Amino acid sequence: MKQIVIAVCALLAAAALFSGEVAAQGQPNMYGPTVTADQAKSVAAAAVAEARKNQWTMAVAIVDPAGDLVYFEKMDNTQVGSVDVAIAKARSSARFKRPTKAFQDALAAGGEGWRLLSLEGAVAVEGGVPLDVGGKIIGAIGASGGAAQQDGVTAAAGAGTLK
């Protein structure tokens, strides 16, 4: 019984710490209507154009607010492993309503940031960005194929097409 009480107290303490960190960051935007197929294609086209401009090869995934795939594009010669990573980055960004770089930075800072390792579906690598229209998150984009910063630049270029 004592072990159960200790475990419950530990869980409550962890929840309190995490909620305080989220509150300090400000509340993320609310979800809006789901990204349309046309919007998804436009976002992906802008991301691919940015990658081509920089001579990067990328996999680009667009998901709805639940993290379900809406559109996907893999540029020629993109490493196969980037397919699943792009989808995971988009899904993480949509479900947690923040760029995956926020997780990357928190994990790199150590300390309480290590808690991210226990969040199922949280990807702590730059390259996932929420799609925000009028202050509402309608989905997310994930890009993978280059260095993390290149993935982030590519995803941001796509996300920047929606306002």
Model-derived features: where do they sit?
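Bacterial N-terminal signal peptides
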Residues: 7-21
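Positively charged n-region of N-terminal signal peptides that target proteins for export
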Residues: 1-4
